[in-house]
Design a protein with these regions (language model features):
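A short secondary-structure junction motif
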Residues: 19, 47-51, 55, 79, ...
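Hydrophobic alpha-helical connector segments
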Residues: 18-50, 61, 67-71
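C-terminal peripheral helix-coil segments that are non-catalytic and often amphipathic
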Residues: 66-85, 97-100, 104-129
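Short linear capping/connector segments at secondary-structure termini
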Residues: 54-62
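HTH DNA-binding helix-turn interface
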Residues: 1-9
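Amphipathic alpha-helical interaction segments
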Residues: 7, 35-43, 93-97, 116-120
Length: 129
């Protein structure tokens, strides 16, 4: 039981971020760093389409935010080192892009729209040949 609605929301957000951090860390040792990175972003995009509070969740502060950013940073750097993600992108850029995607899709319930927008985001992150 939670004393207030805010406490329940905080507990849900904490659990969601903790799960995302765990998944990102588990993907960090994948044989294909590009697939690990884009697969994780796809998971985030899919979850955002299903659970509208994810933008608030990735805006969390404190140690959860640090853990999430560190896990994203590790996946991002490994993908960049493997040549899968363009150089020059930093984790804070990635967060801005994700938040922008979430905001732009906030009113859409069409999964095809979410898939297309994520595909464009992912293509923009891919290293140029």
């Amino acid at each position: 039981h939670f004393p207030a609605k805010e406490a329940l929301f905080e507990a849900v957000v904490t659990a969601r971020i903790t799960d995302l951090v765990s998944e990102a860390r588990s993907r960090a040792d994948a044989a294909d760093p590009g697939e690990a990175f884009f697969g994780f972003l796809s998971r985030i995009a899919g979850e955002a389409a299903a659970k509208r509070d994810l933008p608030d969740a990735i805006s969390v502060s404190g140690s959860l935010r640090e853990d999430l950013f560190a896990a994203l940073d590790l996946l991002l750097r490994r993908a960049q080192q493997a040549g899968a993600v363009r150089a020059g992108i930093v984790t804070s850029d990635l967060i801005v892009l994700l938040k922008g995607m979430f905001a732009g899709l906030a009113g859409s319930t069409d999964p095809a729209v979410h898939e297309r927008v994520f595909a464009v985001l992912a293509d923009g992150l891919r290293a140029r040949a």
